[in-house]
Amino acid sequence: MANPTVNELPYDKDDKREVEVSSLEVKPPVGEVVEASGDYSGFTQKTDPREIKLVRKLDMFIMPSLWAMYWLNYLDRNAIALAKLSSIEKDLGLSDVQYQTAVSILFAGYVVFGIPSNMILTRVNPPLYLCCIMVTWAVLSICTSFCKNATHLYLVRFFLGVCEAPYYPGALFLISNFYTRTEVALRVAILYTGNILATALAGLISIGIFKLDGHRGYAAWQWLFIIQGSITGLVAICTYPFLPSSPLTTRWLTPDERQLAHDRLLRDKIDEVQPGSTMDGLKQAVKDYRTWVFAFMFNNHLAANGFKNFFPSVVKTLGFNQTITLVLTCPPYLIAGVVTFFLSYSSGRMNERTWHITVSKIVAIIGFALAPATLNTGVRYFAMCVFTLGTYGVNSLILGWASTVLSQTQEKKAVVIAILTSLGNLSFVYTPYLFRNGDRPRYSLAMGWMAAFSLLTLLSAWAMKFILKRQNRNISGTGATTKYPY
């Protein structure tokens, strides 16, 4: 069957108008590609006041809810790192290796359930699904406080990973269902600041909670899990009314806004494929080699981010007391949050990914190299700030990039996001074992590996750029690339 015709416009590198696809009289069968007018640069320019108003309305309803949920997701997940500064190891009789296993086993659960969960997400009500799993992980977080030994902790942490696995890829799936390619990166960055600020503020929050040590017979680390888990469950219930399922069924949009939200995403598609089953989406994602390039890139990026589960312990090697140590964990992440926002804004504004990733990773490598090179307290803390800001800014760029390039069907996009987040989080299964107590205070082995992972992320970004440049030339048919190729 011949592909439907596409209205042709002469190529002009300075012309940023959207190219409209002619109406289709006959839909191709499932799995057949429909040639689209766009390319992988993803550049569109909003001029319609109705569309501008619509995007602002989407931002007001979607982003605060997803952000609050993700903030608590990471607050609950990172509680184990702060519990190490309390008495969890002593109370549960944990050895160094057992604590590392307790950290890593959460991500084993995450990897196991990540892909099946996102396949389910395309067949259920996403807001209800995400809020239900949030309530479940809140209960499991509270259950952590009642663990009596390493085995109990392993079980709770594993199932906590299973329940937390759907949230982040599910949130990315929702964002990519309502925003165009040029809008996604900034929204993912805003979402990701929830991760950063949770990590930044966790230490400050725990200062107050740790003062409850011994109250009603519970240790400080137990109160940490009880209080944070309770708040998580409450927020899960409160955010449900604000989360939409799809553009055409969103309750708080008018009929005209629903249609506009739907139509603008259709115009933004590349090589659209007719929707199929979840298994069709799985096959499409697995067979597309670009999925695996992005997965390799994201795995190495998160491996370079492996320090986050031990950051309070790394800061503790500076020699300050518990309260000062908790305070000092905050500034690096606050700085990283600001950098992440502006980096993603710049990336979206310039419609560029590779150089932004490159510069960030070079900064991170410098920080990882500097941290073990000296025992000077000021220089080491500066290095911690540098490798934190250099690492965190990249996350939203990679995921936003992948979710827009590989979005030919909803089913494929959901699986791609799940593959990336699952294989990315697989890195957290093995990176905890790089942070050995015997390597304190320099942690030279861990820092060396973090630098190597950063370099591999950088190189894979350049590989993807050249892949998409070649495909852009094929799409345009002129031998020219777009003004801002990825």
Give residue spans per PLM region.
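Primarily marks hydrophobic transmembrane alpha-helices of the MFS/SLC 12-helix fold
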Residues: 130, 356-357
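Helix-to-loop junctions at the C-terminal end of transmembrane segments
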Residues: 112-125, 338-352
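Glycine-rich segments within core transmembrane alpha-helices of 12-TM secondary carriers
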Residues: 185-218, 225-232, 417-431
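Helix-breaking motifs and short loop linkers at transmembrane-helix boundaries and internal kinks
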Residues: 92-93, 116, 124-125, 146-152, ...
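Extracellular/periplasmic helix-loop-helix junction of adjacent transmembrane segments
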Residues: 81-113
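Extracytoplasmic gate region of multi-pass secondary transporters
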Residues: 81-82, 280-345, 395, 399, ...
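Intracellular terminal tails of multi-pass secondary transporters
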Residues: 1-72, 82, 86, 96, ...
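Conserved MFS/SLC helix-loop-helix module at the cytosolic interface between two early adjacent transmembrane helices
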Residues: 111-151
